Structures are given as C-alpha cells and as structure tokens.
C-alpha cells in the first residue's frame, strides 16, 4: 500500500528527534471509510509531545520507560497522531494550561485574536484560525500535570569601560534625586527602570546645557568679552541716525540721542529761534566745534586770558549762531551763555539724559586723515586727540605782535612737536616719555587741557582682538555651515532627465514585515510589489507577520488579512514550527507558520512566502510578536545559513523547502533584499532603478530611494510633513550619498546586497552583522533606543561599521509613497522614536573607527553636525525669536551673518524647486516654516524627555550596575539552546528519504551524491546530484564528483552525449505512451509518489489526477489557493518537482523538462494547452517560445526541451551559413529576456557536435550580437 503523508519523518515536530529515523507503522482500515492519512507513528524518542514542550521544563530528562499511545489531532488540513504520557512524570509539564478568555481589546485599540478551538471534527466546516499551536489535551484538568515553579537565577555580566564611566557621570548629575522618591512617587520599583530614568534625566540636562551654551555663546558671550560693543558709533554709523524719530549726534567724543529734544524750542534768545527742520540739518554729525569750551575753563593754569580763542582749521558752521560760545566771548545779552561755566554747569548735566555711547575712530581713518587732510591728531591711551586747531592758531598768530596778544602756545612744545611729527599714529609710548619729563603738576595740567579742549573720541575698541574673536569664531562656523548647505544644494541639484536602465535579471527578495496594518494598506503594498516592472520569476514577495494580532480598526488578525489578500484557502492551515526569536528568556522560543504560492495581479504572477509568527501556546498577550527587528533577523539568519549551508531551525528548513521545492528557485540564487514596509507602495520602475545602481557600482551594498507622502492633503498634520520628507532625502541623504555613507537607509524603501558581486562575501547576512543586530539583552537606555526604537537606522550603522570600504547610496530616481501619520498623537509617537533613535545612532557613528574623509572634510564631521543640529534644535528656534525681537525693536544692529545663513538655507532650497520645476514645494516650504516651532521645539523637547518611554520585560531584571552588572532571571519557561533542533537541509532531506525508502522501490542515494558544502560563496545544488525518487531506478548513475560551474550550466561543459545516452537508456526517463495515456504501471508509479508530494495531504492539487491528464491541470497557486506549509520533502540529491511556474527551475542534465505531454488540457491561470498538448506556463506564454536553456532544461530529443525544427549535423566540416541559419532559427524561438549567450553557444555546440565550434566562441558571440542588433 502506498505510504501516506503521516508516515513521513518530517512531521511538524519530528525534527526534535535527531537520534534516529522514526519507525513507521501502517494501520489497517477499520471500515471502508478509512482515512489513509490516519497513521499511528511510534518514535524511539521517549515522548514527542513532551519534547516539543521542553521549553517549559528546564533540564528535561529523557525518560525511556514511557508508553506511547496514539492521540489523533483534528481540526486542520491533515490530522496526525502524537503520543501522550500514560504516566505523568513529576515536575514535567506535558500539556499546556488552558488560557484565560481572550479576544479582548487593549487600551491602544489593539485586539488580540482568539485562540482556536481544536475540538472540531476533521471534516468540520469551522474556519480554522491562525492557531499558534497544535491541539493540546487538557491534562492538567485530569490531574496529570504538576506545574513547574518559576526559575530564579542570577547572572553577573561584565560592563564595558565606557558604560562604567557613563554610570558615574549619570550619578554625578542626578545624585540629588533620592531613589526612594523614584520608588514611591515615580512608581519605579525596578532598579533598571530607575537607572534608565536617571540616564534620561542626565541626557536631558546635557541637551538643555548644550542649548544654553549655544544661546549664551551667540548672544551673551560676545557682550562679556566686549561689554560696550553695542554702545559705540563711528562716523558712518552715526550718519545712519538722521531720521525724524532717530536723531543722533556726537559732542566731545560722546554720542547722544536727541530724538526727544530737537523738536523743542531750546533757544533763550528771541532773535535766534530754532526749528525741527533746522535741527535735522545737524543730525548724524559730530557737533563738537559747535560747543567750544572757554579756554580758561578747559585749560586752567595754562590759559589765563579770557579773550583767547582758537581758530578753526577746517570747519564752517551751517549757521553761525549755532555755535554755542559761552563766557565773556558771548555777544548776546540776557542769555545763559553769558555764564563762563555754562558748559560745565548747564550743558554737561543736560547731555547726560541723552547719552548713548562713544564716538569712535578706527586706526585706518586716523591715518588717512593725517595724510590726506593734514590733521594733527594722534592716539594716546586709546583716545583720539586733535591739535589741528591749536597748531593752526599758532601759525595764524605767529606774524602778529603786541603786548596785548594772548599766549597761544600754552601747551608744552615737546608735546606739540610730537603731534606734528607723529600725526595719525599711536603716540602712547612717546607721550608717556614726554610727560614723565615734566613735573607732576605740569603733566596734570597738560592732560587736563588735552581732555577738555582737544579730545575727539575713543579708538574703536570693537576692532580689538577681545571684541573680534567672537565674531570671527561665529563667522568660521557660519562659513562651514554655509559650505555644508551649499554642498547639499549641489548634491540635490541633479538636473537632466531620468536614466532609463535596462531590465535586469537579478533575483530579489521583497521583504514586507507587517504588524497591525489594515487591509487597504496591505493590499496597496502587495499590489505595488506585484506590479513592479521586474521579471516576476526573479522577485519573491516575502511577508513576515509579526504576531497573530488584530489591529485597531481591523476585524481579523493581520496574518489572516494577508492570507486572504493572497488568495489562501482559509481551510488550509500550516503547522507551527520552532525557531529562535529575539527576546528575553522564554521569548526566544517561538513558533511560525509558512505559506507559499503565487499572487496574480494585472497580468503579473509573482511567488510569495508568508511567515506567520504565532508564538508558543502559553502566549496570550500578542502571541508571536517579537518586533520588526526579529522579523528582519529571521530572514537574514535564514539566508546566512543558506549561504554557509549551516544547520537550520525547523521553520527555516520549511522556508528552504518552500522556496526550493515548491516555488522552484534555490534560495542561494537571491542577491538582494528589497525592504518595504506594509504601509508603503512602490512605483513600478523603482526596484529596477535601485538594482541598476548596484549593478553599475559593485561597491554599493545598500541603497534607498525617495519616499513621498501618499496622503499629503489628508490633514494639517500630514501637510507639515511634506516638505520635511523632501529635504530629508534631497538634501540630507543626497549629500551623504556623495560620501557613499548614507547614515539611515529607511526600512520602508531600501535595497541591501545579500553578498558581494565579487567573491560572494556575505554582506547584510554576514554573521557579524546578524550577531550584533540580534542582540537579545536590550537592558539599557542606549540599547533600547538603538534596538527597539530605531532598528532600521541601527542596521545601517552596523553595515557602515562592518563594511567601511563599501558604499551606502541614495538615488532620487526610485520613488515610493508611504502613509504618513494623519493624527497628532501618532505623529508625536513616531517622531519621539525617530528623534531619540537618531541621537543614539549618531553617537554610535561618531566612534566608528573608519569613516571617509578627514577633519572638516570627513563624514565624521558631517555626523557631528547632524548630532549637534538635532540636539540644539530648541536653541535654534530660540535664537530666531531673539533675532526677530531685537531687529524689530531696533535695540541691536542687524545680524547680517545670521540673516545670510537663513537666506542661504531656504533660498537655495527654493532654487532647487524652481530649477526642477516643482513649484508646489515652495508652498509646502512655507507651511513647514510656519510649523518650524513644532519641529524644532515641541517635538524635540517631548522626545528628549520621553527617551525612556518604552516597555520593560519582566524576565531579566538588572538590580545593580558598576564594574559588573547583576541580572536576575525570573522566568516561568526558561530557555536554552537545546530546545530547538538544528539540521542542515541535506540531513533533513536524507531523513525524509530514509523514511520514504521503507515504502519505495528506489534505494537511498549514496554518500557520494550528497551535497557538499561550500563556504564563503553562494551555493546551489549540483544539478547532476539532484535526482527524483520516482524517475530514477538507482543512484548508481549519479556522478561521484561534481563541478559547480560546469553542472550549473543548462548543458554542461562536456559529456553531453553521455548524459543524453544515460537518459534515453533509462526506461523511466522516456516519455512513453503508457505514461501519457495513464496506463496502470505508470499510474501506480505516480501514486507511489503521494507520500513524497510537496503538496501533501489536504492540498487542492491531486498529482494522481494531473498525471493522468485529468481535466483542469491546475497548480493550487494558479487558482488563487495557497500551499500551506506541508512537511513533505523530496529526497536529497533529487530533482525538484514541478515548480509553481509549471516547469522545473533547475533540471538535471538529460531530464526532460516538459516532455510529458498530457492528454488533458493544461489550462492554467495565464496559460493554456498548446496545439500539441504541451504545457504553457503562466507568465511565459507559449512554451515553444521559451528556451529550454533559459529554463535550465537540457537539449534532448524528447520532451518540451527539444530543439523544435532543428536537426543535429554530425559532420566535421560545416558552412558558416548553415550555422548562422540555425543560430537565427534557435534565437527566434527563445525568450530573449532570459536567454544567455552561453546557453545559445551550448545549443549550437549540440547541433554541430563534431564541428569543433567550441574554439570559435568569440565568432559565435559576434554573430549573436549582430543578429540581435538587426532584429
């Protein structure tokens, strides 16, 4: 009797027994309704069910005296029996406790799905939900279970030196907050939670300090160094104050504001009245000569004559009566100016109310005045003295004589000579020497006279180093920032039309992690991936459902929504399989289900894999959920083990089987991972553009495109995000791409290279990257923000850290659209995660040992600027508000540098829009500017203070940190690595073969045919070592030694005739009529394959009927139904069964690809039977147009892979014309998008086996190019 699926050793949990092959027994039917799938399976292993649940029992003993009794599990596609304990063992949990009622909704709107009922009969119509575990008998209710107590353990871990120093700094900054307040008021019972709060507070204080330092340095530090810098005016600056409401003037080296004075009538002489119009003529000028001090008052003890007055060398008053002469020289009567002390007693006290600052001169103007205007002025002790009028007066009266003339030479002659010989210079040193030669009284008289009569103002102290150092530093930083802005502008200014790359043929995995997204969002994402302008056979949609969870607004769990969208029959239920997740304690043990199939959308038929993480039976809250990082690591770890042919978990083995045996593509073929979020839709040409960039530059290991908003007009919240999304790509990422170091490749739209193009070195699947990225102990604030909040950014950081010589790039040509948060609360939560993860990741990047560039021209400097810019965002907004206030109130000069930076920032951005003719972005920029306080103040401050806002696990608790970290482990279900069995796929297939060989005619393959391991490069099975159990009579024909590159060729490099002869000489390889018509021997032979069918029991595909040519030759995927994960494998070193595309993707040499011409119609979704009954596969059109070489099939005389219409010429001498004719004929029948030159040459070699055309490969290549160019 043929074996059934339940007899296979690859039962969903039989992988736990790695010691021996199972002993399969056949049960006799009790009646005519016997279900052939019901078979009892006995195991050498003591208790399979207990072994499966060993994660709940630490150090589970392997008892061998347990009786095995079959127990039938029902309620899913295919039943199976498992032994249970007849006599329970103390302390062993052999069954799962019934859960509390479930299906309840949480406070955040998330509803957890109900656990299924497994008591329904096998043929029940009850819809089977995504149950996390198989049925478990309620053994505890029967008193058969002794519950295990919690396991308490203490683990001491060493802390790094950096961590120890950070803890010290944290306590230094937060020591003033006692812990008992955090315990009682803050309700922080755990030490690690309190430590994270202290770290958060310390970081927040540092950020506030940084903002305060920036504002202090920009606004106040300069004033400390140069206190009166805003209280000094030179001649040009004073001239700017000539308005009606801005009336400044200088008198005797001091500046006064006469705005509230000049309009009043201040003259006490009726004959000389004033007016505001007349007063405005004096605004903004130095009025010292209009207020001469009597010389007897200005120079006491030196001038005794009240008649002495000085002549002006270069001064003409606007009106003569504006000169305020006081004392005896005043000609008017009844005026206050008649008082000789009017200047000191009346004028000076009145001017004090209008005083503003100093009237200053710089050295250059003093020097030029001495040269061009012949002024006799000089600098002494930073004060400017002008003796021009004094020297002019002496010269004027030098020819006069008389005893009544005053003594005009009242100053010391040495001082006068010094001013004449050193005019325009600083004479401080010489002046001190002259004064020291005088008596103290005489020197004092000389200085009093100079200060009262000849003082003009101060040397401009704003030009001194003390006052200029601040401005120069700000200018230097401004230049660097403006240069960075300009570089970003140039990076974004990529004019010209989009490039149109040719369609590439690289194999790509489209990874889509999903959590609680809705049906509309998921459908939009899946449809966009299916509609990509990329070869459908070379892209794989890989969806990972992170838990069996009902999202807010959904009526079904997210995995159910995904499977319904893909057309999976809800009656098909996969079995949960073990794998290791990222988590604490028992959370590391997880179960997942695998589904595969084809998804059809608008003419595209794309294979898919769906992995549903369903969790352990004991999980009630969010079963299976481990986070997005775990979903990414699941695929990365799987591809890593595929690459190195390493032992895999049961879930990974099932994925391998589905990809290799069901879909028909070896997972080692895939070269790229296309990461797309479940709320993101990609444009049709996006993937090909991203892959084209990596194909052009093999140094690129990661690349992203531009992400735009799909709902930009939905709400005000989305509107303020449009421009922010644009500049984050076209300025930030475009600039970083110049260095080849994009610091954040978003997980919603990025491509990573799986392995390098040269050498096959693993990249994103590198063990180093995975080990760091899969860190399970996330117990500090820094790790929480890296791994829990910003996993996508940290993955990019790890790639840059471990592959510093490679490039991370950005291309604006590839575009995707994502759904931005439309509610303020959602945006707040998103930006909190993004901002905090950005800070922690930038800190990590700062300390990477190898980053391109040097000093200010390095990526490290750019990262520092980004980090500083993120931290001081609130200070930036505060400074802008300050500028607006001081400029609008006129209390300070216009900050030209600051305004130039702002203008450069937004002006260059606007120029980009204009040049690219994206004028709408100018409007979005204005919206962004109006919302600038939100982006720079509210969101950052909220994010900084909420840096410790995340969940803490209860399994691992850190109770103390110092030189060592003490961790208390408190777990109901302790985890150890031995709970998960690991096998290589070769071993897994071998066990499957051994089990099937008990009921098969074919012996097991020899050891020589087993797949060998290749380390360090991607590896595919040798076609010659892959044999089908039902098509090969023995394993003796398997070659003992294989050449990878030779055997991966559709035809091989030699011995073609030998292999063809082997095929034709084997009766099982001939497409005889008895098989075609479904004769009894072949029908029995096909029926004997049922136990090894990849579709397994419960599948909608019936291999018996299809082999007989029955109606509707439909692959289950072609009808919209999906293949649930079935534990059915083909034996090792055997050829894959028919793939989802209707033909083997990798056939061994000499094996007919589609040689079996069925009697029935081969109708499929997207294909139909050809005129000769030949299979026409979906997505490929007429089979006659498809090259057998491009499909991996051989050139044989039988089967669909034969050279139709072409005969083999065995002559040694052939004409070139004949070769060209057959070359043209052969190419006309091929799919030119997939056929290669090598396949074409191999076909010609086969058509002319004795012509020696192998030596004319170059000539053949030229003819191929010529024919293609002419077609």
UniProtKB/Swiss-Prot annotation:
Presence of the UniProt keyword Membrane in the record: yes
Glycosylation sites: 407, 713, 836, 1055, 1161
GO annotations of cellular component type: cell septum; plasma membrane
Catalyses which reaction(s): [(1->4)-N-acetyl-beta-D-glucosaminyl](n) + UDP-N-acetyl-alpha-D-glucosamine = [(1->4)-N-acetyl-beta-D-glucosaminyl](n+1) + UDP + H(+)
Superkingdom of source: Eukaryota
Enzyme Commission designation: 2.4.1.16
One Pfam family of this chain: DEK_C
Entry keyword annotation includes Transmembrane helix: yes
Annotated membrane topology: Multi-pass membrane protein
Single annotated GO MF: chitin synthase activity
Reported induction: Induced by the antifungal agent caspofungin.
TM regions (residue ranges): 165-185, 201-221, 473-493, 867-887, 894-914, 919-939
Recorded phenotype for the gene knockout or disruption: Decreases cellular chitin level. Decreases capsular diameter. Increases extracellular vesicle secretion.
Subcellular location: Cell membrane
DEK-C domain residues: 1213-1269
Keyword line: Cell membrane, Cell wall biogenesis/degradation, Glycoprotein, Glycosyltransferase, Membrane, Transferase, Transmembrane, Transmembrane helix
Biased composition (Polar residues): 21-30, 1027-1037
Location of the region described as Disordered in the Swiss-Prot/TrEMBL record: 1-45, 58-117, 999-1081
PANTHER family per UniProt: CHITIN SYNTHASE
Similarity comment text for this entry: Belongs to the chitin synthase family.
Function: Polymerizes chitin, a structural polymer of the cell wall and septum, by transferring the sugar moiety of UDP-GlcNAc to the non-reducing end of the growing chitin polymer. Produces a large proportion of the chitin that is not deacetylated to chitosan.
Protein name per the record: Chitin synthase 4
Organism: Cryptococcus neoformans var. grubii serotype A (strain H99 / ATCC 208821 / CBS 10515 / FGSC 9487) (Filobasidiella neoformans var. grubii)
Gene that this polypeptide is encoded by: CHS4
């Amino acid at each position: 009797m043929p074996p059934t699926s339940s007899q296979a050793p690859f039962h969903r949990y039989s992988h736990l027994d790695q010691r021996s092959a199972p002993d399969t027994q056949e049960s006799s039917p009790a009646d005519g309704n016997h279900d052939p799938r019901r078979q009892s399976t006995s195991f050498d292993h003591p208790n399979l069910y207990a072994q499966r649940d060993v994660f709940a029992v630490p150090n589970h003993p392997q008892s061998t005296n347990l009786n095995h009794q079959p127990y039938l599990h029902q309620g899913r596609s295919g039943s199976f029996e498992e032994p249970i304990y007849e006599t329970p063992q103390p302390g062993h949990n052999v069954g799962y406790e019934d859960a509390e009622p479930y299906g309840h909704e949480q406070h955040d709107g998330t509803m957890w799905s109900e656990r299924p009922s497994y008591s329904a009969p096998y043929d029940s119509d009850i819809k089977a939900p995504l149950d996390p575990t198989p049925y478990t008998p309620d053994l505890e209710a029967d008193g058969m279970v002794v519950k295990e107590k919690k396991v308490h353990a203490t683990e001491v871990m060493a802390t790094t030196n950096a961590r120890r120093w950070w803890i010290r700094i944290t306590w230094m900054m937060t020591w003033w907050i006692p812990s008992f307040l955090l315990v009682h008021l803050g309700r922080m019972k755990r030490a690690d939670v309190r430590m994270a709060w202290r770290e958060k507070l310390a970081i927040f204080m540092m950020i506030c300090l940084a903002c305060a330092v920036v504002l202090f340095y920009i606004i106040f530090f300069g004033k400390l160094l140069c206190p009166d810098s805003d209280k000094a005016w030179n001649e040009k600056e004073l001239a700017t104050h000539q308005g009606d409401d801005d009336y400044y003037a200088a008198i005797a080296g001091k500046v006064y504001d006469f705005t509230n004075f000049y309009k009043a009538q201040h003259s006490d002489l009726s004959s000389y009245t004033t007016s505001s119009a007349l007063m405005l003529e004096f605004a903004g000028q130095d009025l010292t000569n209009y207020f001469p001090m009597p010389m007897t008052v200005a120079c006491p003890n030196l001038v005794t004559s009240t008649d002495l007055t000085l002549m002006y060398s270069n001064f003409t008053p606007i009106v003569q009566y504006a000169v305020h002469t006081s004392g005896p020289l005043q000609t008017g009567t009844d005026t206050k100016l008649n008082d000789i002390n009017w200047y000191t007693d009346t004028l000076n006290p009145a001017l004090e109310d209008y005083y503003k600052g100093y009237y200053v001169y710089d050295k250059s103007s003093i020097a030029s005045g001495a040269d061009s205007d012949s002024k006799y002025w000089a600098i002494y002790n930073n004060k400017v003295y002008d003796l021009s009028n004094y020297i002019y007066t002496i010269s004027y009266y030098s020819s006069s004589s008389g005893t009544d003339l005053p003594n005009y030479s009242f100053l010391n002659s040495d001082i006068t000579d010094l001013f004449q010989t050193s005019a325009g210079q600083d004479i401080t040193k010489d002046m001190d020497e002259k004064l020291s030669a005088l008596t103290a009284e005489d020197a004092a008289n000389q200085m009093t006279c100079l200060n009262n009569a000849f003082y003009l103002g101060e040397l401009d102290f704003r030009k001194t180093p003390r006052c200029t150092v601040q401005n120069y530093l700000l200018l230097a930083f401004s230049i660097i920032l403006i240069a960075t802005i300009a570089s970003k502008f140039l990076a974004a200014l990529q004019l010209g039309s989009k490039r149109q790359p040719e369609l590439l043929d690289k194999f790509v995995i489209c990874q889509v992690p999903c959590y609680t997204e809705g049906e509309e969002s998921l459908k939009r994402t899946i449809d966009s991936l299916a509609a990509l302008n990329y070869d459908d056979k070379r892209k794989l949609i890989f969806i990972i459902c992170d838990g069996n969870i009902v999202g807010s607004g959904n009526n079904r769990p997210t995995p159910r929504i995904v499977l319904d969208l893909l057309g999976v029959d809800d009656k098909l239920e996969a079995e949960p399989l073990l794998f290791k997740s990222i988590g604490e304690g028992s959370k590391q043990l997880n179960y997942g289900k695998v589904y595969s199939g084809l998804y059809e959308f608008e003419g595209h038929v794309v294979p898919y894999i769906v992995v549903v993480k369903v969790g352990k039976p004991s999980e009630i809250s969010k079963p299976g959920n481990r986070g997005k990082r775990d979903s990414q690591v699941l695929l990365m770890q799987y591809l890593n083990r595929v690459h190195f042919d390493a032992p895999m978990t049961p879930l990974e083995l099932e994925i391998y089987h589905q990809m290799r045996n069901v879909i028909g593509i070896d997972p080692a073929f895939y070269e790229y991972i296309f990461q797309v979020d479940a709320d993101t839709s990609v444009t049709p040409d996006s993937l090909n553009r991203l892959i084209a960039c990596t194909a052009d530059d093999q140094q690129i290991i990661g690349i992203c495109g531009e992400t735009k908003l799909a709902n930009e007009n939905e709400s005000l919240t989305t509107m303020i995000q449009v421009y922010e999304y644009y500049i984050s790509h076209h300025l930030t990422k475009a600039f970083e791409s110049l260095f080849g170091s994009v610091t954040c490749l978003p997980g919603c739209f990025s491509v990573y290279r799986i392995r390098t193009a040269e050498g096959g070195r693993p990249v994103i699947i590198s063990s180093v990257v995975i080990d760091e990225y899969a860190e399970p102990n996330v117990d500090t604030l820094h790790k929480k923000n890296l791994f829990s909040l910003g996993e996508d950014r940290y993955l990019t950081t790890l790639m840059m850290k471990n592959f510093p010589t490679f490039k991370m790039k950005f291309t604006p040509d590839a575009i995707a659209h994502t759904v931005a948060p439309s509610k303020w609360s959602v945006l707040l939560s998103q930006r909190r995660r993004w901002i905090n993860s950005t800070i922690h990741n930038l800190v990590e990047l700062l300390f990477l040992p190898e980053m391109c560039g040097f000093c200010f021209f390095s990526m490290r400097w750019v990262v520092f600027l980004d980090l500083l810019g993120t931290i001081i965002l609130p200070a930036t907004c505060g400074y802008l508000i300050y500028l607006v206030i001081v400029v609008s109130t006129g209390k300070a000069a216009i900050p030209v540098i600051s305004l130039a930076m702002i203008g450069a920032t937004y002006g260059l951005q606007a120029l980009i829009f204009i040049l690219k003719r994206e004028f709408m972005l100018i409007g979005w920029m204005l919206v962004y500017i109006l919302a600038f306080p939100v982006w720079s103040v509210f969101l950052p401050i909220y994010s900084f203070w909420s840096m410790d806002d995340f969940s803490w696990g209860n399994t691992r608790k850190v109770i103390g940190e110092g030189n060592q970290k003490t961790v208390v482990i408190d777990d109901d279900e302790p985890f150890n690595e031995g709970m998960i069995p690991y096998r290589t796929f070769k071993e897994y297939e071998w066990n499957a073969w051994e089990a099937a060989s008990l009921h098969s005619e074919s012996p097991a393959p020899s050891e020589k045919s087993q797949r060998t391991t290749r380390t360090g490069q991607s590896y595919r099975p040798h076609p010659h070592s892959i044999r089908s159990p039902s098509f090969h009579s023995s394993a003796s024909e398997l070659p003992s030694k294989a050449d990878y590159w030779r055997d991966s060729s559709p035809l091989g490099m030699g011995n073609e005739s030998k292999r063809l002869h082997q095929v034709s000489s084997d009766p099982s390889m001939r497409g005889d009529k008895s098989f075609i018509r479904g004769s009894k021997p072949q029908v029995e032979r096909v029926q004997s394959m049922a136990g090894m069918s990849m579709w397994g029991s419960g599948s909608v595909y019936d291999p018996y009927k299809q082999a007989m040519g029955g109606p509707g030759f439909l692959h289950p995927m072609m009808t919209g139904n999906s293949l649930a994960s079935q534990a059915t494998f083909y034996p090792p070193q055997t050829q894959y069964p028919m793939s989802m595309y209707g033909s083997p993707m990798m056939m061994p040499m000499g094996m007919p690809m589609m040689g079996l011409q069925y009697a029935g119609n081969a109708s499929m979704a997207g294909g139909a039977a050809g005129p000769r009954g030949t299979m026409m596969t979906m997505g490929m059109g007429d089979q006659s147009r498809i090259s057998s070489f491009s499909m991996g099939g051989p050139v044989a005389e039988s089967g669909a892979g034969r050279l139709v219409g072409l005969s083999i010429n065995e002559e040694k001498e052939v004409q070139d014309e004949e070769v060209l004719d057959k070359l043209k004929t052969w190419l006309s029948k091929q799919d030119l998008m997939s056929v290669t030159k090598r396949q074409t040459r191999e076909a010609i070699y086969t058509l002319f086996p004795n012509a020696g055309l192998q030596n004319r490969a170059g000539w053949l290549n030229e003819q191929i190019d010529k024919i293609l160019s002419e077609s």
